């Protein structure tokens, strides 16, 4: 069964891709990760004080929270317009949501990785042996459980800037749709 009018398939595809890009932003997940990083930073000690007291860390948190809020407002604008501009064409702001949303996802996972420090990198027996010996069998990885799992979303979300149309392609779409270049 055909979706949409005959010979208008590309218009339907662009509309669907715009919706996909809007969803890829995953702002709720980024906010959740930033909140988790703040919780971790309250419990993690660095230089004799809680990491959350570090001015640089707090500035990164504040910047991320501000950017997430700004993108949430942009997302509401795009969604309330049905993903289309007044002229009926797909809203190019879905590309902005995709680009900035994936950058925020990556930055939020970097924040968690930084809070975990070296405990974020899982240690395997071979690597531990190279450092001077193997742990006893079934010995847990040192540090809190969350730290050993921090690397997985960090590494996986490097791909977020590629799937759904790479961020570079999205920038080209914006250049054409918004600037007319």
Spans of features found by a protein language model:
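Glycine-rich beta->alpha junctions and the first turn(s) of the following alpha-helix
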Residues: 1-71, 160, 176
């Amino acid at each position: 069964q055909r979706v949409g009018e005959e010979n208008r398939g590309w218009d339907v595809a662009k509309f669907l891709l715009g919706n996909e890009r809007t969803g890829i932003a995953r702002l709720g997940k980024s906010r959740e990760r930033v909140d988790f990083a703040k919780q971790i930073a309250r419990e993690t000690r660095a230089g004799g004080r809680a990491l959350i007291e570090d001015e640089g860390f707090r500035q990164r948190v504040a910047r991320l929270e501000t950017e997430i809020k700004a993108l949430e407002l942009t997302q509401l604008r795009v969604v309330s317009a049905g993903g289309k501009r007044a002229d009926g064409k797909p809203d190019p702001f879905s590309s902005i949501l995709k680009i900035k949303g994936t950058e925020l996802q990556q930055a939020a996972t970097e924040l968690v990785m930084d809070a975990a420090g070296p405990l974020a990198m899982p240690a395997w027996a071979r690597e531990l042996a190279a450092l001077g010996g193997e742990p006893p069998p079934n010995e847990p990885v040192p540090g809190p459980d969350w730290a050993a799992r921090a690397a997985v979303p960090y590494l996986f979300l490097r791909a977020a800037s590629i799937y759904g149309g790479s961020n570079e392609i999205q920038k080209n779409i914006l250049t054409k749709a918004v600037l007319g270049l």
